[in-house]
Amino acid sequence: FMLRGFFYTNLNYKGENMERALKKYFVIFALPTLIAFAISFLIPFFLGIYLSFTEFTTVTNSTWVGFENYKKAFVGNPDFLNALWFTLKFTVVSVISINLIAFIFALLLTRGLKGTNIFRTVFFMPNLIGGIVLGYIWQIIINGVLLNFGVDITFSAKYGFWGLVVLMNWQLAGYMMIIYIAGIQNISSDLKEAAQIDGANSFQTLMNVTIPMVMPSITICTFLTLTNSFKLFDQNFALTGGAPAKQTAMLALDIYNTFYGRIGFEGVGQAKAVVFFIMVALIAFVQLYITRRKEVES
């Protein structure tokens, strides 16, 4: 008994020493990661905020102008406001359509149908293709159809808008579907059986059991589709390039055109980028707050 007590005491002593040593050297182990994070994110982030208040051509050649760049970004700049409105419309339509299509596919593929794994793989594959490549592929496809009517995707803003919506649905619906499938498969069969015993039909079971139980998946998918749609650049650049007359330019593309397309407007482009970051962050936080409250309620 005494030997066993000594053994446990010795183990506890060694454990305490190890814990003390880990606390002592934790900063040393974490330092490389912290340095990499500071170099790759923190320094560029705060430098970008500073440059948004300056007129500059290079980082070392800047002149403080205060809020002048922010005034130029909004006042007398219809391109930025048009890009904002276009982005908001596109985001709303894309978030709803992508999640709706993904959820319907997830419901169908969790019913024990044959070839389910093949369908999952096929639906997920578009997400593996780069945005620039997807943009050019869909430009060829859509123009191939529209040219039969004597127009192309840059003929009207509505063609560019719906072309981008179709592209985003094709790219992201499969990825969101996988997340929804995981959520649906985690629902206990006892809950569905209890609902059926209580006389609930398929629609009532869907609304009162399935959807409340997959709210965590809905939160994730809504967040991903919202942020990806709002900050879309590659596909917009390749599919329409903002044509016709910048009517289909989204915010990210408008910032790119301002920064690289107009000499002396680098500071204005940086100011737009700061505003863009704040907008995306605020919208994402509001969405997470609302959907997480739904999780708690359900």
Where are these regions (language model features)?
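A structural signal for multi-pass alpha-helical bundles of membrane permease subunits
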Residues: 19-298
